[in-house]
Amino acid sequence: MELNKKTVVLGASNNPERYSFLAVEKLKKYHHTVVAVGNKLGNIGETPILTGFPAEQGVDTVTLYLNPVLQAQYYQYILSLKPKRIIFNPGTENAALSE
């Protein structure tokens, strides 16, 4: 079983009250490689929050913290990462992308 699964957290925030912040911290605690992507530069602990569409290889999981309207600009990016799975967190469910 592979323990270090690269995860892209899309909709990352440096606000400790946001679920995306907690997700990054939890993933790092369990030694996963995390790529945090948000709309503002910043950090979650030692993890930088990147903006735009950072190129990544070997992505296991994309976990979404963006509502469906905001996801639209990332459709091609998400698919280009070729993740093994996409996690739609509560409030992010999107029939168009899940197909």
Language-model features, listed with the residues they occupy:
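Alpha-helix N-cap/loop-to-helix initiation residues
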Residues: 16-17, 71, 93-94
